[in-house]
């Protein structure tokens, strides 16, 4: 939040672990996907095997495609984060299309991911990677004009990681 003028009254992000016990998690998740400005998938092998992760991707992609049909926005608002090194991942085609490497992140980030950097005690590299990713996320949020959508757009989501 230090990079933005966000007032801190509400959380600037959504992590599906914050859904309260007894809450309608699908509705809450769909609302978050219909209103967030940036989608930040955390790339792990397990991520690409989870049905709802593929459905979340589908929802956000639909939202971007829908807006492109009705009004322009300035670019893709999916910013992937490598949790492990790229050599440990088999990306489904939909994810392989999205650039996850950037020179400012460096080779160490690509080889180890955030988790690998942290576990190896490479705290300076870890912090610089997190800082660079935070700057990218804020920049994308500010530059893309992705508008909220109606959650009806998400009524028949499919796992876009499956069967590709």
What is the role of each PLM region?
Residues 1-30, 46-52, 111-117:
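Conserved BB-loop
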Residues 1-2, 25, 32, 73-164:
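C-terminal interaction surface of TIR/SEFIR-family domains
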Residues 30, 52-58, 94-98:
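"Short basic amphipathic alpha-helical interaction patches in structured regions
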Residues 36:
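An anion/phosphate-binding loop that grips the pyrophosphate of nucleotide cofactors and donors
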Residues 45-67:
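Conserved TIR/SEFIR loop-to-helix hotspot centered on a Trp-containing motif
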